[in-house]
């Protein structure tokens, strides 16, 4: 299946799993914002340290604005394959199209590592 138009780079499975792990750790020891509206606000305010976007969002327009907004605000972002998995990592019983890590807590080093690897992928 072709990737949606808002997916600007390929994320290795291992890195996507690290991103989900970072969301879980930040949920427990830091602060996250769940859902596209909260994520968008966190990016616009410059609060987000890392934005995680699901690749299976339909319609695409729900999250299509996030990659250019993150680039404008110089906030790293990464894709994960499943909105269901992203929702679960964020502690929700429903799917989440996107999540923003505001304070990574104990996931700080992991978030920094992911941000560095994402910069490499975007080149």
Curated annotation (Swiss-Prot):
InterPro entries: eL8/uL1-like (IPR050257), Ribosomal_eL30-like_sf (IPR029064), Ribosomal_eL8-like_CS (IPR004037), Ribosomal_eL8/eL30/eS12/Gad45 (IPR004038), Ribosomal_eL8/Nhp2 (IPR018492), Ribosomal_eL8_arc (IPR022481). GO terms for cellular component: cytoplasm; ribonucleoprotein complex; ribosome. Gene3D superfamilies: 3.30.1330.30. Disulfide bonds: none annotated. SUPFAM superfamilies: L30e-like (SSF55315). Signal peptide: none annotated. The keyword rRNA-binding applies. GO terms for biological process: ribosome biogenesis; translation; tRNA 5'-leader removal. It holds the Pfam family Ribosomal_L7Ae. Transmembrane segments: none annotated. GO terms for molecular function: ribonuclease P activity; rRNA binding; structural constituent of ribosome. Its main location: cytoplasm. PROSITE patterns: RIBOSOMAL_L7AE (PS01082). It is found in: Cytoplasm. Keywords: Cytoplasm, Ribonucleoprotein, Ribosomal protein, RNA-binding, rRNA-binding, tRNA processing. Multifunctional RNA-binding protein that recognizes the K-turn motif in ribosomal RNA, the RNA component of RNase P, box H/ACA, box C/D and box C'/D' sRNAs. HAMAP family: Ribosomal_eL8 (MF_00326). Part of the 50S ribosomal subunit. Probably part of the RNase P complex. This is Large ribosomal subunit protein eL8. It comes from Thermococcus gammatolerans (strain DSM 15229 / JCM 11827 / EJ3). The lineage of its organism: Archaea, Methanobacteriati, Methanobacteriota, Thermococci, Thermococcales. The gene is rpl7ae.
């Amino acid at each position: 299946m072709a990737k949606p138009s808002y997916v600007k780079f390929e994320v290795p499975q291992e890195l996507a799993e690290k991103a989900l792990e970072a969301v879980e750790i930040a949920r427990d020891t830091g602060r996250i914002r769940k859902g596209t509206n909260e994520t968008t606000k966190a990016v616009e305010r410059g609060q987000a340290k890392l934005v995680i976007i699901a690749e299976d969002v339909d319609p695409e327009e729900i999250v299509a604005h996030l990659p250019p907004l993150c680039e404008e605000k110089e906030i790293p972002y990464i894709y994960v394959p499943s909105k269901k998995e992203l929702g679960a990592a964020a502690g929700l019983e429903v799917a989440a199209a996107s999540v923003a890590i505001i304070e990574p807590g104990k996931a700080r080093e992991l978030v920094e590592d992911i941000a560095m690897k994402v910069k490499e992928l975007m080149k």
